[in-house]
Amino acid sequence: MASEQDRPDVKRHRARWRTYQGLIDPKRLVFIDETWTKTNMTRLLGWAPKGERLVDKVPHGHWKTATFLAALRNDRIDAPCLYDGPINGERFRAYVEQFLAPSLKPGDVVILDNLGSHKGKAVRQAIRDVGARIVFLPKYSPDLNPIEQVFAKFKTLLRKAGARTYEAVSDASAQILAQYAPDECAAYVTNAGYA
């Protein structure tokens, strides 16, 4: 838990949010975020015979970073996108306009964290233009965004895949996304307090 959650202003905002959570139909919620991936990811844990060290190979000095963006709904992962390189305001705006907005319906509630690139005027407008609302989570509250749970599993499976090129990361990402069942997505949303 972030120590900033103990600040009085953050506590108040989180308490208000907890009340708000119960007022929204989970079927209308769309949680957005991004996470990084690298071509040198490997498993963090594993098994080896007793007395032997577990060894896995990773490239050093020759790896690439990519950014994975997606939306979590109550029954699916929606609008997935993988960018070669880091995210910035322009790329996030392009993601919203090209991937997210076409997947939204009037009445949807898009929930984001407080990253600066999420608050751009063009981003907010693209979401509102389709009749959806945009709501920002309380500061220092990743625990209130269930897509963080999705990303934890996603990265674990990506590490297991051992993808070493951008194309391999892209292919592995598609295979991993196919593994998220509707009831699993609903469980993430419920576990974060929505429902």
Could you say what each language-model-derived stretch is?
Residues 1-195:
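Short functional hotspots at interaction and active-site rims
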